[in-house]
Swiss-Prot record:
Binding annotation for FAD: 162, 266-287, 308-327
UniProt lineage: Bacteria, Bacillati, Bacillota, Bacilli, Bacillales
Name of the featured protein: Acetolactate synthase
EC number: 2.2.1.6
Reaction(s) catalysed (UniProt annotation): 2 pyruvate + H(+) = (2S)-2-acetolactate + CO2
Primary enzyme class: transferase
Keywords from the named record: Acetoin biosynthesis, FAD, Flavoprotein, Magnesium, Metal-binding, Thiamine pyrophosphate, Transferase
Binding site for thiamine diphosphate: 60
An annotated GO cellular component: acetolactate synthase complex
Record's note on what induces expression: Strongly induced under anaerobic conditions. Activated by ResDE, Fnr and ArfM.
């Protein structure tokens, strides 16, 4: 190629829309979720020629949830693309959820032409201002030449440190403008090293001199890139541990003896009492958004070792004695495991033994249970039996989420996905769609209540169109029960929680999905098996009896439960 030809090629002109797509290709994006509109249709048009694949959703919020699932499962930003006005504003809940829960997402939206931005005109909105409080990065591109810089920085910022959402707005005339601006390359994020040696040595000393050191694994500690190192530490040092809801999957089958369940939302679990008895707590990748430290360090007297990529968010109940700041697996691997000797005295051994027994008892369906509807623990048990350890299960928010989060064992990272930062209704089905694209051909299970189901049930059409192998289980009781049982506890009555019943089987069939119903608890295993063996999307209606829900928020700590364990353990 001659010099003149090279210069001519370097001056090839493209629309801004094509430059946006070139940026996505450079970042390795495989899917873009969204809904088109006039202010952004130039980008959708360019995607037709260059990729990535467009996944048309039925609501922008759900498109953001799908992108969030991709971000959580891959560690790379999922991408959502929408138009101006309500197209952009409908992203708010999805981006807030992703940003709060540490999931990388890049959202791109159209806007009115620059000349109309300050006018009271159709769909004019200060997009960047709208998303500034709920994202890590929110900008509007005012010059076509800045597109590569804005998009590339959005990807970098969404993934860096505490991952989250980034937003870029494009006025219509900017994406339609022609330019010879070159793209910029994707720049890999710098990799952190381990924490400082002296901090690691000090942490080892505190653990070795503790009477009952406990590991609290948070969401970053339970992610695929950290899990091998975390499990190795737990196995070598034989420390008891608990998971937050979003760290589900830290547990492996050979760590069952050291595992004391998950903690979150209500302070009444075996893991809560374990932390109550601990004198040293090592937190790994823990974020206070998962479970406020005031619930597990109520007196503020625990010795806390904070191991994370970012500094601790200081709180009256969270003032670490040591901070091990660095790459999580590198820091853990830098610990000389064989040098850490932990031996529990008879008192502590008794505490652990009694807690294990209490934990086991709490996982059983009551012996005197009688109902023509399934007990929550029956559903959890049969679902666990129906799926292998690598099946991704996405969980909506509601009473069912508490039962799933506490009792559904997860043995691989990110195989139980839950929204515990914002507790956003409607995430399960869109997340399952995103997961099915990350893991093509693999069965995905999603779980919701009948309340949360209708927040995003329109995406069943998306699942059918994609022939996604999703089994969605609806725990059906015609009530916003997570609100109801808390109202009963506070006021001895409920208000504004009841709604009408729908025929979930017919709803599924109207979209071209398979609809199944569990008519009695003894059918659970067979119906779940039938659903797992079916082709394409399946919706299973499971009538549930939530009579035991009133105990979910019981105040067992620090009084009754604490006294019970005190008499047993001491």
């Amino acid at each position: 190629m001659t010099k003149a030809t090279k210069e001519q090629k370097s001056l090839v002109k493209n629309r801004g829309a094509e430059l946006v797509v070139d940026c996505l290709v450079e970042q390795g994006v495989t899917h873009v979720f969204g809904i088109p509109g006039a202010k952004i249709d130039a980008v959708f048009d360019a995607l037709q020629d260059k990729g990535p694949e467009i996944i048309v959703a039925r609501h922008e919020q759900n498109a953001a949830f799908m992108a969030q699932a991709v971000g959580r499962l891959t560690g790379k930003p999922g991408v959502v693309l929408v138009t101006s006005g309500p197209g952009a504003s409908n992203l708010a809940t999805g981006l807030l959820t992703a940003n709060t829960e540490g999931d990388p997402v890049v959202a791109l939206a159209g806007n009115v032409i620059r000349a109309d931005r300050l006018k009271r005109t159709h769909q004019s909105l200060d997009n960047a201002a709208l998303f500034q409080p709920i994202t890590k990065y929110s900008v509007e591109v005012q010059d076509v030449k800045n597109i590569p810089e804005a998009v590339t920085n959005a990807f970098r910022i969404a993934s860096a440190g505490q991952a989250g959402a980034a937003f870029v707005s494009f006025p219509q005339d900017v994406v339609n403008e022609v330019t010879n601006t070159k793209n910029v390359r994707a720049v890999a994020a710098p990799k952190l090293g381990p924490a400082a040696d002296d901090a690691i040595s000090a942490a080892i000393a505190k653990i070795q001199t503790a009477k009952l050191p406990v590991v609290l694994v948070g969401m970053k500690g339970g992610r695929p890139e950290a899990i091998k190192a975390v499990r190795k530490l737990l196995k070598k040092v034989q420390l008891p541990f608990v998971e937050t809801y979003q760290a589900a999957g830290t547990l492996s089958r050979d760590l069952e003896d050291q595992y004391f369940g998950r903690i979150g939302l209500f302070r009444n679990q075996p893991g809560d009492l374990l932390l109550e008895q601990a004198d040293v707590v090592l937190t790994i990748g823990y974020d206070p958004i998962e479970y406020d430290p005031k619930f597990w360090n109520i007196n503020g007297d625990r010795t806390i070792i904070h191991l994370d990529e970012i500094i601790a968010d200081i709180d009256h109940a969270y003032q670490p004695d040591l901070e091990l700041i660095g790459d999580i697996p590198s820091t853990i691997n830098h610990i000389e495991h064989d040098a850490v000797k932990v031996e529990f005295a008879e008192r502590e051994q008794k505490i652990l033994s009694d807690l294990k027994q209490y934990m086991h008892e709490g996982e059983q369906v009551p012996a005197d249970w009688k109902s023509d509807r399934a007990h929550p623990l029956e559903i959890v048990k049969e679902l666990r039996n129906a799926v292998d350890d690598h099946v991704t299960v996405t969980c909506d928010i509601g009473s069912h989420a508490i039962w799933m989060s506490r009792y559904f064992r997860s043995y691989e990272p990110l195989t139980l996905m839950i929204s515990n930062g914002m507790q956003t209704l409607g995430v399960a089905l869109p997340w399952a769609i995103g997961a099915s694209l990350v893991k093509p051909g693999e069965k995905v299970v999603s779980v919701s209540g009948d309340g949360g189901f209708l927040f995003s049930a329109m995406e069943l059409e998306t699942a059918v169109r994609l022939k996604a192998p999703i089994v969605h289980i609806v725990w059906n009781d015609s009530t916003y029960d997570m609100v109801a049982f808390q109202q009963l506890k506070k006021y001895n009555r409920t208000s504004a929680v009841d709604f009408g019943n729908i025929d979930i089987v017919k709803y599924a069939e109207s979209f071209g999905a398979t609809g199944l119903r569990v008519e009695s608890p003894d059918q659970l295993a067979d119906v779940l098996r039938q659903g797992m063996n079916a082709e394409g999307p399946v919706i299973i209606d499971v009538p549930v009896d939530y009579s035991d829900n009133i105990n979910l928020a019981s105040d067992k700590l620090p009084k009754e439960f604490g006294e019970l364990m005190k008499t047993k353990a001491l």
